[in-house]
Amino acid sequence: MALKAFPRVKVRKDYNGKVVAIKKKLSGYDDASFITMMYDHFQTILKPELGISSNFPWCCFLALKWKLSEPLKRNVSPMNKRDFIDIVNRIYNLQNEVSGFFDDKKVLLSLRRMIINQQLYQAPMKLELNTLARQYYWYCNYDGGYFDKVFQETHGITLESYYKISAYFAMMSCIDNGKESEYIPVRLYLIHLIPMFGTDIVKKYLDLVSVKWNELRGFMSGFKDIKQRESEYYLDPPMMMKPFILIDEGLIILSKHLLRASLSSLVPTLLKDKHGSSYKDRFAKVMESYIGSILNELPSKIISEKEIISIYKQNEVQSKTVDFIVREDVGTVYIDSKAIEPDKIIKHSNSAKSIKERLANSFIKGVIQGMD
């Protein structure tokens, strides 16, 4: 006689209720002790073989967001290490309350949004530094100085200065791999930066990448999700926009990985938010030129889009084209350059339909052009 599988017991999920409880708990602690506990938590990597992900940094930064975007109770008390760990564990366990998190029909998509949430803190240091260096090359050497002009008009600092100062802080963050949090005394970075860039440029740079201690609550409040949607669990932390906390004595870095990721994402984010499709169109052309310059170094036969169009005209063919064709003896590679950056919905959704719709005019379009 064949055994029948036991029916699954459906447990009522209560994400919203548990978030409210966590926020209520957080509001009973003073801000300074919470940030101190978070800084201390990242001074030791719990499992070096797993890296900083073993400290659950995505949970810590969500706790920071909720802590500073909710009003304090009238009487607050200092937070200790046990209190902090309890909050982090409760936030980690929230994933059990997220609708469809363990959906058997969407296993890969469900795992995907969880992995995206964590990979920010797992990127190799070399990759983070290379990303910053490549960006400097793209924005400062292409399109006739357009990116530098529009960036300087808005923020009062050249891209050259931004990337050089960012490289300084990125390298500083690589000195001690055994700690994720760091403190840089004001006298140290001023001695290194003022002689080369001057006081005004350093100030404008810090205005761009740091938030003052007494402005932390105002900054975090701008990211508050009043509806407490489950998607908030997977979003990038607000500190991606301001990776430094500025105090009179120096700069506090809560996460070196987040710092390096922020420094390399800030410029494209600011340009995209300010100039929208105009920026995207220009950057797409930059990427096409950059890829072309790399392909030209290959010994292979490279056919550009311009040459492809010419061949089409000669043969009276009407069809879409890719940007490059690379011909080898063993086969042909079709390359189409697309300046694609996944939006928030793509990052946190586990709906195949929603992801497909969002990628229809970018990634999927490029694949179809290559097939045609």
Please report, for each region that a protein language model flagged, where it lies by residue.
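Residue-identity detector for threonine
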Residues: V9-K13, V19, T36, T44, ...
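Catalytic core segments in nucleotide and nucleic-acid processing enzymes
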Residues: V267-D372
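Interfaces and regulatory segments of ATP-dependent nucleotide/adenylate/phosphodiester-chemistry enzymes
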Residues: K24, D31, T36-Q43, W66-S69, ...
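Long, charged/polar, low-complexity intrinsically disordered N-terminal extensions
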Residues: M1-R90
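Long, acidic, intrinsically disordered low-complexity segments
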Residues: M1-A21, S221-K227, E232-Y233, N315-D343
